């Protein structure tokens, strides 16, 4: 946890270095006391710096990183030139992290960021991914509505939402009304997940709980924005 003096300015949440990777799946870890902790395994190995941006050339300081691999036939020429200029292998995902100018200057294009240099056990992180798509779903599944009566005069309206508005006045359905529709397949962030273990050798990050998306889906891991301060910090 970062400690700051009363007369100093804490690092903005948008200026913290993260990593990109993929969701491997879920398992459990047993502590020395025999406690079973459900964890999600995230592969954040081989994060490569593809570009370093500075105030002088770009107007802000940031680094761009890539993860994974992509076949040469799937890389368009502008991207191929971008990767070649950085001296980095083409990846499946690109992500930019804004940093303080001094922090961004520590990196060079083509460098590999090790997971242990960014995260440590006991830290809290925010994980962003694409949720699992459920297709077209009704209000009971999509919005946790209650169902109508199973009998006693109800024959065809067991799972309908009921009234969705008023009469001729206002004569419309208000925006934001919860109704049936496409469910899932949206970007979601789970906040304040505890880092249970960091496997530096294999580049794995194990966080407590679940993260959005299928196994094999792309994820972005950042230091937690709303991490509670430790007592005495």
Swiss-Prot record:
Pfam families: Ribosomal_L3. PROSITE patterns: RIBOSOMAL_L3 (PS00474). Methylated by PrmB. InterPro entries: Ribosomal_uL3, Ribosomal_uL3_bac/org-type, Ribosomal_uL3_CS, Transl_B-barrel_sf. One of its GO terms (molecular function) is rRNA binding. GO terms for biological process: translation. The modification N5-methylglutamine is found at residue 168. Residues 146-171 are annotated as: Disordered. Keywords: Methylation, Ribonucleoprotein, Ribosomal protein, RNA-binding, rRNA-binding. The keyword Ribonucleoprotein applies. GO terms for cellular component: cytosolic large ribosomal subunit. Belongs to the universal ribosomal protein uL3 family. One of the primary rRNA binding proteins, it binds directly near the 3'-end of the 23S rRNA, where it nucleates assembly of the 50S subunit. Part of the 50S ribosomal subunit. Forms a cluster with proteins L14 and L19. This is Large ribosomal subunit protein uL3. It comes from Bordetella pertussis (strain Tohama I / ATCC BAA-589 / NCTC 13251). The lineage of its organism: Bacteria, Pseudomonadati, Pseudomonadota, Betaproteobacteria, Burkholderiales. The gene is rplC.
